[in-house]
Amino acid sequence: MASTWKPAEDYVLQLATLLQNCMSPNPEIRNNAMEAMENFQLQPEFLNYLCYILIEGESDDVLKQHYSLQDLQNNRATAGMLLKNSMLGGNNLIKSNSHDLGYVKSNIIHGLYNSNNNLVSNVTGIVITTLFSTYYRQHRDDPTGLQMLYQLLELTSNGNEPSIKALSKIMEDSAQFFQLEWSGNTKPMEALLDSFFRFISNPNFSPVIRSESVKCINTVIPLQTQSFIVRLDKFLEIIFQLAQNDENDLVRAQICISFSFLLEFRPDKLVSHLDGIVQFMLHLITTVNEEKVAIEACEFLHAFATSPNIPEHILQPYVKDIVPILLSKMVYNEESIVLLEASNDDDAFLEDKDEDIKPIAPRIVKKKEAGNGEDADDNEDDDDDDDDEDGDVDTQWNLRKCSAATLDVMTNILPHQVMDIAFPFLREHLGSDRWFIREATILALGAMAEGGMKYFNDGLPALIPFLVEQLNDKWAPVRKMTCWTLSRFSPWILQDHTEFLIPVLEPIINTLMDKKKDVQEAAISSVAVFIENADSELVETLFYSQLLTSFDKCLKYYKKKNLIILYDAIGRFAEKCALDETAMQIILPPLIEKWALLSDSDKELWPLLECLSCVASSLGERFMPMAPEVYNRAFRILCHCVELEAKSHQDPTIVVPEKDFIITSLDLIDGLVQGLGAHSQDLLFPQGTKDLTILKIMLECLQDPVHEVRQSCFALLGDIVYFFNSELVIGNLEDFLKLIGTEIMHNDDSDGTPAVINAIWALGLISERIDLNTYIIDMSRIILDLFTTNTQIVDSSVMENLSVTIGKMGLTHPEVFSSGAFANDSNWNKWCLSVNALDDVEEKSSAYMGFLKIINLTSTEVTMSNDTIHKIVTGLSSNVEANVFAQEIYTFLMNHSAQISAINFTPDEISFLQQFTS
């Protein structure tokens, strides 16, 4: 039913004025308008007025009298975006049910009728999409939702491109809801699919309509709905026809995506057509001018190679066709060659422009990812360059990179077959007179390094010296790529061929001072990879002084952009080696000098804060003279960011600093705590329990929606509990425990796993040092619920930390685990599996001490298997200070002596047992 609402002219004019003033460059006018807008938002008809200005803003007679055409168009777009924002997030006026939406539902589609104004039609499409995602999903019985879908389909049938674009956005956000019943018990999915099929089958529709329709269908494929499955053969028939006949790039790109989705969800339907599909993709890669299409085709080949649904024997016949084309597309295109040749001059002396510096988020150190409390970066991509196969970290994803990535995965899967085809080709071109051929060849070698390592084995002793020579090549791209490729061979060098380490790493270190910035960047990244992959003893013995001296030179020589990469390398170096007095004298002064020159709002602080965090932690008490100044500034930045964040909830005009300022400040403070230990207590708590500001700030940070903020804050909390007087935390203990519980119970996002790990780790330290008393029942239940769950897959590092924390809780309250959910052989066995691999003696000892207290208190009616007893003895016999809890061990052995005599132990385990039986 059409809305009978009509706007009041004075309100329309008033709102139009506010919209214009909200965009004013004058802050006073803008702020006053924002305040007035907040009052306007309280009116029930607010959304209707915004919609009216969006769709009638250029035809309303009153508005035309007061505004120019340009102002009217700007106002329409502003009204549309405000309408969209008013339906989203914390500003969602729909959920409050206090605002009339009738006019919006009945008339918003009119914004698509006049498609001459692209801005207005695009904004209208966004509003319609938002209306579906925030209102119609929850109100599927509202007939206007179904009516709007049919109107969009009808408009598309008449050639209206904004309508199909709106449908495409709606399908992307809400496709799964169209499987459900809407008004009149109708399931819209069938009508939608039939319409999309009709649009893509008819060549008379525009390329935009055809491509967007395929895009709509692509949102349905992963859902595997019955309505699509029964139409799948029809879709395949149409899509194969399009692949043969439709030469439009927009359509072809979507066809490639369709095949990629089908490969993932219905590979059985593609197997008999793979010859044609692969040839189609190779044809696109080699012939189309639009690189986006070629990238999508190459993405299919990448998916084809990595799909768990495609056995190796099916992929193998295509290697001979795919690999040569991948190699050919790894050469820079003509335009890039011209640009690179024109910019080969030295540029290291030129200052970087701020706009040329890509924002770099801090390298988050997952400090507590292992239960032993040490750094554990297993879940991180240690080699930052692996995401950019050609090392071009400043350019967007392109065909060259996609080809290199595809060659990489194919070499990992079928190394022998790929090498047989690729290596003769590469050997022929290694000495090419054309620099871009040499560069692409070196890129290919790097791309194949991981998978083909053992097949390279015979040739690498000759190949490595050749690559080192290329560090002196006249052309900067060749030198740059050589740095990256040599780093890819670092595992081969470091594991079994250390005789190559000095001949390779010394020239790369020398290349740090290259006169071309791109080469500097590649060299420092390569050095960082070698540091990361090498044993600390190797770095300290062979390269410690040389790296310190080189870092010092680089700190003086590098410009802004490469300093960011350098900070990361120094941070990795500090994590790997125990820095000494020499390091403090060489690299600390320039770091502190740069730190002092940067403003609190400079984004260059992010990597520098992370770097200083690692350096402070490594230097330990030697960092003490600088600690007060460094801490005070980090604390000031942290407080400022948290304060602005809180104020922004009341005042949306406040610009909130990026979360990275909070994360890096927390990490630097934590680095000081780790490095200085108890000596840093007076920094954080200068008045003892009289000033707990840092804890109040941390409580705010632990409620931040960004996982990395909470992750860093839990790490700091754990270290405060570990190093400082426990009385400092007791006053806020209940609040911290509630937030720890919330993290463990409700953070089920895989990206948030490190935050969960740190929360559990912190809880373990708290329970070890502070008697949880009345909180122990609730906290143990939270831990056990996750430990014993069989409804989800628990990350191994999470399980490890859960196990350690159970042990630590058992130190003071073994009774809560000696009966109930934990008290059975299966859980004990699982506990041992998680804890036995720990290397940290202190952590493992405290975990086992608490665990044995629990076991010794458990009723003898609960039987323990020989396998579990064996695992306990295995765990106790290595990396454990048994003398600290010898009585608990003795009691356990006595209680299970009959079973122990029947178990076959290793010599080390027997030696351990003899300590308690002799």
From Swiss-Prot:
HEAT repeat residue numbers? 11-38, 43-92, 103-137, 145-181, 190-222, 235-263, 275-303, 320-413, 421-449, 461-488, 501-534, 542-577, 583-620, 628-678, 694-725, 777-814, 825-858, 867-900
- A Pfam family of the record is HEAT_EZ
Q: Which UniProt keywords apply?
A: Cytoplasm, mRNA transport, Nuclear pore complex, Nucleus, Protein transport, Repeat, Translocation, Transport
* UniProt xrefs under InterPro entries: ARM-like (IPR011989), ARM-type_fold (IPR016024), HEAT (IPR000357), Importin_beta (IPR040122)
Which GO BP annotation is one of this protein's? protein import into nucleus
Q: Which GO molecular-function terms appear in the entry? A: nuclear import signal receptor activity; nuclear localization sequence binding
Question: What segments bear the compositional bias annotation Acidic residues?
Answer: 372-393
Signal peptide positions on this chain: none
What compartments host this protein? Cytoplasm; Nucleus, Nuclear pore complex; Nucleus
Query: Region Disordered: which residues?
Result: 361-395
* Miscellaneous comment text of the record: Binds to nucleoporin FxFG but not PSFG repeat regions. Present with 2130 molecules/cell in log phase SD medium.
Task: Quote the subunit structure annotation.
Answer: Interacts with Ran (GSP1); interacts specifically with the GTP-bound form of Ran (GTP-Ran), protecting it from GTP hydrolysis and nucleotide exchange. Interacts with nucleoporins NUP1, NUP100 and NUP116. Interacts with NAB2 and HRP1/NAB4; via their rg-NLS. Interacts with TFG2; via its PY-NLS.
Q: Which family does it belong to?
A: Belongs to the importin beta family. Importin beta-2 subfamily.
> Which PANTHER family does the record associate with it?
IMPORTIN BETA
Q: What is this protein called?
A: Importin subunit beta-2
Q: What is the lineage of its organism?
A: Eukaryota, Fungi, Dikarya, Ascomycota, Saccharomycotina
